[in-house]
């Protein structure tokens, strides 16, 4: 039965956390409505408080009805419901991605306020299949093709207990129990490639890949044991132990839903057993991240790891140092990897960072000047600035705000600054790093630069920590 499978999944995913409360994302579609009823049964059995969260993206007239419907269901189940709104501000550029990020920002921030550690979402088996196909068409590597049933966002654990349950079973459950749900009209539009894939697979047809990009990444030819995920999986299945470029295209060009699920499981197994442990080892061995918001990569140690892991390490550092949430595309990272192999010093910019080779190390620090971080007023006790630093005031300091150091301000206070520790740690790149650090000002006057212990008055006391909101499916550090 459906509930028994759900119960087995969620108990395995959550483990022995001893949770007293949990949250669930519900939109009004069949997937999330079914999840709500299943989770409600499980929560009652385990004496767990269930909080229901809906997000209105203000894009469809029907969304208001959906939110109201979920509120009514929540009330009937005696569960607390929270309705949140995402405002696109009439900016429709890359809207789907921005809406997704906005939705998760809203939901996880609410979880933090409510002291909830886990958020359930209704990603089911068909979603995983569609994602695999879309990533295959983007020529993703093995990390990109893999999937996970547990993710992290804003230090909230995102759990997907429907991962091995097809949508048809969820719909059957709702019909059997006479439960209403809403259909999003955009899901039937051929405008989105995901919908085309979904409709074909729903009819039992094979998935036929669109070859809009090269199938085989040439730079991985030398990695004889492991290369891109598709290539690796073909090698595993081939009786001869080898696979030509032609056979790769044939294998990935046409696949049934069952074959896609099989490939997905093999990919996940390879990630979990080999690549993920290697990535964690690589970060531990080759990476040093400093409280000043810059990092060094040991290129001698870096060289021993596989190409796919190297890409992940560079992206890991770019996200951490830039404060951005999106990873850089492979075609952007590739030139950096090629430069590293040439064994010459260089200086490049990428993803809001400066990447500078200094002999056998790679220094990565925040690019300054292209897009300056916004100033933040210190109204509360603490504030996050530049998506990277948490600044806390330990006394009442009226009218102060956090910003960056301008060249004008630097010239005024230059002689009062002790930059020797920063100079030594950054291999004499202290001036560039200094301009990326948070400073506290009152009106036009710099009153504190906590990183270098500069205060214009002994009464000031601020704490600062490097706390980037890092999001990854493969590593998580609170």
From Swiss-Prot:
InterPro entries membership: Rossmann-like_a/b/a_fold, RPE1, TilS/TtcA_N, tRNA_Ile_lys_synt, tRNA_Ile_lys_synt_N
GO cellular component: cytoplasm
SUPFAM superfamilies: Adenine nucleotide alpha hydrolases-like (SSF52402)
Annotated positions binding ATP: 27-32
Subcellular localization: Cytoplasm
GO biological process: tRNA modification
Domain remarks: The N-terminal region contains the highly conserved SGGXDS motif, predicted to be a P-loop motif involved in ATP binding.
Function noted in UniProt: Ligates lysine onto the cytidine present at position 34 of the AUA codon-specific tRNA(Ile) that contains the anticodon CAU, in an ATP-dependent manner. Cytidine is converted to lysidine, thus changing the amino acid specificity of the tRNA from methionine to isoleucine.
Listed name of the protein: tRNA(Ile)-lysidine synthase
UniProt source species: Rickettsia africae (strain ESF-5)
Originating gene: tilS
